[in-house]
Amino acid sequence: QVKIWNRTKSKADALVGAGASLVDAPSDLANVDVLFTMVSTGKDLRQVYFGDVGVMSGDNTPKILVECSSISAPESAEFRQTAIDRGAEYLACPVSGNGKCVKAGKLSAVASGDKNTFDTVREIIECYAMRGVSYVGEGELSRFCKIAHNVLLGVYIQNLAEITILAQAAGVPRHAFLEFINNSVMGSIFSQYKTPALVNLDWTTTFTPPLLRKDLDLGLQAARELGVSMPVTAATREALQSHFGSASLKDDPEGYLAADFSALIETVALQAGIKLVSENKDVK
């Protein structure tokens, strides 16, 4: 039996159509055997767990909590300890991929916590993380893996935008340049996946600049705490901030920042004095 809750009820329609039961509040899930959570921030997760109608607002707690959000290691450690104090098991298991990856069966996950807990829920995780789930050890180690993953995401998209605009400034069409990159040893699944957006300026949201900024900040915070120098990440964070400045010039700044993070290329182009237009190319 699968029970679900979503802050935006309409987003649960597909699962309800597949047979899941939609509950009215997180507190209605307090008695389940295994609870999976995925929200945007640690603040959101705290509300889901401990708010007035939170999962742990009453006396009951799910037997196993599998937490899949991108949050900091200290926040995760706090939630883990609370779960343990209430007699529950807690597995940190963030994922890599967006909605399109899920539909294509290409989502992956990374897990940390008690190995027996992981073994108990692994087959359930693999139902959605079809590319596999990597167990990396105890505690919050998976949080550091996900933070590092999203730091790479930010550095990659920023540099991809920069070199694409560099090529365009020299006279190379974006679609031609990205075709070359994708066919080269430097191409990747990600560059191929983002090519249609960068060529045709399609900012259908998969991941937003505010969420990327949050994750870069988490990465830099972890770097300070662990004594690791990350100058490229710091520069990427500053470059990203300029996109927020560009957004303030838009008619709908909030709406613009809710668009996909690949729109960063518009800020790079603006700084180069280039006005982007869609190339209207059927690129894969």
Regions found by a protein language model. Give the residues of each.
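NAD(P)+-binding Rossmann beta1-loop-alpha1 motif at the extreme N-terminus of oxidoreductases
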Residues: 1-38, 63-64, 78, 99-102, ...
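Hydrophobic beta-strand scaffold residues
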Residues: 2, 22, 89-91, 174, ...
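Helical "substrate-binding/catalytic lid" subdomain
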Residues: 140-267
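Rossmann-fold NAD(P) dinucleotide-binding segment
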Residues: 22, 26-91
